[in-house]
């Protein structure tokens, strides 16, 4: 066992790549370490493609093991269960930049597994996993046009760009961006920002690509020293004769079909033509398979649509390259929801609903770094009917999780701070129609639904999806792409933001050669489109409603002395339980004495506040209270006049005349009016019944000395 180790400096940290010691039966395996973070990345490739398979079966699995942080998993079974949202999102993050680098026609199954085996809880292991995947593919010998590099980029006005910031640095950073690419090209960007201008965002992409060159060089050197022989794989030769025949027979008809603006009608026509092509060419005599005909038919579609776009001809739905589809906005569409919006852009539609909950509705996430509370949830649902199909209904898929997180990133920067608006927020985007850019429709709909619910957003947010078609004779950047343009194009570029700047940016590029100029043009067009969409949204709802929805819970925050917390909670929680049950409210108390009270309506809220106020209230000298006699003694009576507070009415303070026997005047359980005369240094309270009665009657009693309590 002779492991080969490659070390290199990456920013202010040393990265170690090791192969040949662990997982030696995998096609490629690399243990990557950055500081105390270690991720084992393995790649296995099937030697042959499955018969009849017409797609590339790449699967990426990122998994975080509890032992990496010195923890034992919770739950009954005490072992890791289904992938968390973080693991799913990181799996997608690794998948996206490597998928376009496998050669065209390579259909062998490839499985990537990245296992976090150690973490210092100070930095996200995702960058280490991406670097390790690149290195494992590089040494595996599997056909792969890499290696790739990956970098996380932060930004502050004081420091500028920050390479691979820690969790602590990200707390003050205005940007959290992950960039991945090859030596010559950026392939993937995933980011969230606090309304940063386009030039800062583009600069971050270029900075990340420049810095990751150290990673790419190290992976290439590791492959040179420890790599396996590259597979002797050749793509199946294209049947040029069949391709020419299909083009001659169906080229014009396909071109006409792509001038049908209605998606369903266009798909029906293309389906008919595809079936005709299969019937004509996939015969027993020819020996040509139906899959081969369908594949070349798809290639013909691809070439026809792209050539028209580059030639600046009208797009599939008749638009030019910069026009946004017609937009329709409705808010308040669901009467009992706290906030709702129906956002329609062309044939893409999202019904988005916002719900306000109390502090106890937060999502508690168990992760390697410890327990995290998430007070803003955004869930994206993509039912099969949205594209006119029957499909599987079940657990949330990776795509839905990824689109939901992108929409969440777009909106998160404009949410109010928890201190001023301590609601838990849940937004659900139901995609009811889809023809491209449903995640960006979710951003627009989420902004509108939150404003409709009365959530005080800093500014409205809109999102737009851009596309690119690049050929040898030129390129075209497309605004507001359709589903077909996404599928047939070279880039998917999604930007969300306000009038002031970008809040989220996601980019996936399928080809090399995307220049700084192209990205700059795409960002400029996206800005113009975003401002147009915001203008359409503002015609219906330009700012948050002045108050939260009548259907939403009411809340108020009060501050009490921390010593009073135990009084509100009571013995075994009896007091707080009594308040919440009797007033139908929810109470959340922080250790610093911050009390958040939630109730379904103002009446219940006020009742709960009154109960709390009475418990924490201090006796005020000179104030008159109504109390209950709780105990009679020879020298007077003890009266409970505030929750948890009793005071002494001395025998001389019961009546104007001389009182010989207290029981002749008072009984236990009797309700009386008392006036607070004094509170001594030991907190003992002196009360008077006769002064309370005299003050209410408007006469001043004769002055008498008040005896001390014995």
From Swiss-Prot:
Mg(2+) binds at residues 486, 492. CDD domains: KH-I_PNPase, RNase_PH_PNPase_1, RNase_PH_PNPase_2, S1_PNPase. SMART domains: KH (SM00322), S1 (SM00316). The keyword Signal does not apply. GO terms for biological process: mRNA catabolic process; RNA processing. It comes from the Bacteria. GO terms for molecular function: 3'-5'-RNA exonuclease activity; magnesium ion binding; polyribonucleotide nucleotidyltransferase activity; RNA binding. The keyword Nucleotidyltransferase applies. It is found in: Cytoplasm. InterPro entries: ExoRNase_PH_dom1 (IPR001247), ExoRNase_PH_dom2 (IPR015847), ExoRNase_PH_dom2_sf (IPR036345), KH_dom (IPR004087), KH_dom_type_1 (IPR004088), KH_dom_type_1_sf (IPR036612), NA-bd_OB-fold (IPR012340), PNPase (IPR012162). Gene3D superfamilies: GHMP Kinase, N-terminal domain, K Homology domain, type 1, Nucleic acid-binding proteins. It catalyses: RNA(n+1) + phosphate = RNA(n) + a ribonucleoside 5'-diphosphate. PROSITE patterns: KH_TYPE_1, S1. Residues 553-612 form the KH domain. Its cofactor is Mg(2+). Residues 622-690 form the S1 motif domain. Pfam families: KH_1 (PF00013), PNPase (PF03726), RNase_PH (PF01138), RNase_PH_C (PF03725), S1 (PF00575). Keywords: Cytoplasm, Magnesium, Metal-binding, Nucleotidyltransferase, RNA-binding, Transferase. Its EC number is 2.7.7.8. One of its GO terms (cellular component) is cytosol. NCBIfam families: polynuc_phos (TIGR03591), PRK11824.1 (NF008805). Component of the RNA degradosome, which is a multiprotein complex involved in RNA processing and mRNA degradation. Involved in mRNA degradation. Catalyzes the phosphorolysis of single-stranded polyribonucleotides processively in the 3'- to 5'-direction. Belongs to the polyribonucleotide nucleotidyltransferase family. PANTHER family: POLYRIBONUCLEOTIDE NUCLEOTIDYLTRANSFERASE, POLYRIBONUCLEOTIDE NUCLEOTIDYLTRANSFERASE 1, MITOCHONDRIAL. This is Polyribonucleotide nucleotidyltransferase. It comes from Cellvibrio japonicus (strain Ueda107) (Pseudomonas fluorescens subsp. cellulosa). The gene is pnp.
């Amino acid at each position: 066992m002779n492991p080969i180790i490659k070390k290199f400096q990456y920013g202010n940290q040393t990265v170690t790549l090791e192969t040949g010691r662990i997982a030696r039966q995998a096609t490629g395996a690399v243990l990557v370490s950055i500081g105390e973070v270690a991720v084992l990345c393995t790649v296995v490739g099937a030697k042959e493609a499955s018969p009849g398979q017409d797609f590339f079966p790449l699967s990426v699995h990122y998994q975080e093991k509890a032992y990496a942080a010195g923890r034992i998993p919770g739950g009954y079974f005490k072992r890791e269960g289904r992938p968390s949202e973080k693991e799913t999102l990181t799996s997608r993050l690794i998948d996206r930049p490597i998928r376009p680098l496998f050669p065209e026609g390579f259909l062998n199954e490839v499985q990537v597994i990245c296992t976090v085996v150690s973490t210092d809880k100070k930095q996200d292991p995702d960058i280490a996993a991406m670097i390790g995947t690149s290195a494992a593919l590089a040494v595996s010998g599997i056909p792969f046009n890499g290696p790739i590099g990956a970098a996380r980029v932060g930004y502050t006005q004081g420091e500028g760009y920050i390479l691979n910031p820690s969790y602590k640095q990200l707390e003050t950073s205005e940007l959290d961006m992950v960039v991945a690419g090859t030596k010559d090209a950026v392939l993937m960007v995933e980011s969230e920002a606090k309304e940063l201008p386009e030039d800062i965002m583009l600069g971050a992409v270029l900075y990340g690509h420049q810095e990751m060159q150290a990673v790419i060089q190290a992976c290439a050197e590791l492959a040179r020293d420890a790599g396996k022989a590259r597979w002797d794989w050749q793509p199946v030769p294209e049947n040029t004769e069949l391709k020419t025949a299909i083009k001659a027979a169906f080229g014009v008809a396909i071109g006409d079909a792509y001038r049908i603006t209605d998606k369903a009608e266009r798909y029906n026509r293309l389906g008919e033509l595809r079936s005709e092509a299969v019937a004509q060419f996939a015969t027993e005599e020819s020996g040509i398979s139906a899959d081969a005909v369908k594949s070349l038919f798809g290639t013909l579609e691809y070439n026809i649509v792209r050539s028209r776009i580059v030639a600046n001809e009208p797009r599939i739905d008749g638009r030019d390259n910069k026009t946004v589809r017609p937009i329709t906005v409705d808010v308040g569409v669901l009467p009992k929801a706290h906030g709702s919006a129906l956002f329609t852009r062309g044939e893409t539609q999202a019904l988005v609903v916002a719900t306000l909950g109390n502090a106890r509705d937060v999502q508690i996430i168990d992760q390697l770094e410890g327990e995290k509370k998430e007070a803003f949830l955004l869930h994206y649902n993509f039912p099969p009917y949205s594209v006119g199909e029957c499909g599987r209904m079940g657990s949330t898929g990776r795509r839905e999780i990824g689109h939901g997180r992108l929409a969440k990133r777009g909106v998160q920067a404009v949410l109010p701070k928890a201190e001023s608006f301590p609601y838990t927020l849940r937004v659900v985007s139901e995609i009811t129609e889809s023809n491209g850019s449903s995640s960006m429709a979710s951003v627009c709909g989420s902004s509108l639904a939150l404003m409709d619910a009365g959530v005080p957003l800093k500014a409205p947010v809109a999102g737009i999806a851009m596309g690119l078609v690049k050929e040898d004779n030129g390129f075209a950047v497309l605004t507001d792409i359709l589903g077909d343009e996404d599928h047939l194009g070279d880039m998917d570029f999604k930007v969300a933001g306000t009038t002031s700047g970008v809040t989220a940016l996601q980019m996936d590029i399928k080809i090399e050669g995307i220049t700084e100029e192209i990205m700059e043009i795409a960002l400029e067009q996206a800005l113009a489109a975003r401002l147009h969409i915001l203008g359409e949204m503002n015609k219906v709802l330009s700012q948050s409603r002045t108050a939260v929805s009548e259907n939403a819970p009411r809340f108020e925050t009060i501050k009490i002395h921390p010593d009073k917390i135990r009084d509100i909670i009571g013995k075994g929680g009896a007091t707080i339980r009594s308040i919440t049950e009797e007033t139908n409210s929810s109470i959340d108390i922080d250790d610093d004495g911050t009390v958040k009270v939630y109730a379904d309506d103002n009446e219940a809220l006020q009742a709960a506040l009154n109960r709390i106020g009475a418990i924490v209230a201090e006796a005020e000298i000179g104030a008159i209270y109504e109390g209950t006699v709780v105990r009679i003694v020879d020298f007077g009576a003890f009266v409970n006049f505030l929750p948890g507070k009793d005071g002494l009415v001395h025998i001389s303070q019961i009546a104007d005349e001389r009182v010989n026997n207290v029981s002749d005047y008072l009984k236990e359980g009797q309700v009386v009016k008392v006036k607070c005369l004094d509170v001594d240094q030991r907190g003992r309270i002196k009360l008077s019944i006769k002064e309370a009665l005299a003050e209410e009657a408007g006469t001043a009693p004769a002055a008498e000395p008040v005896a001390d309590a014995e």
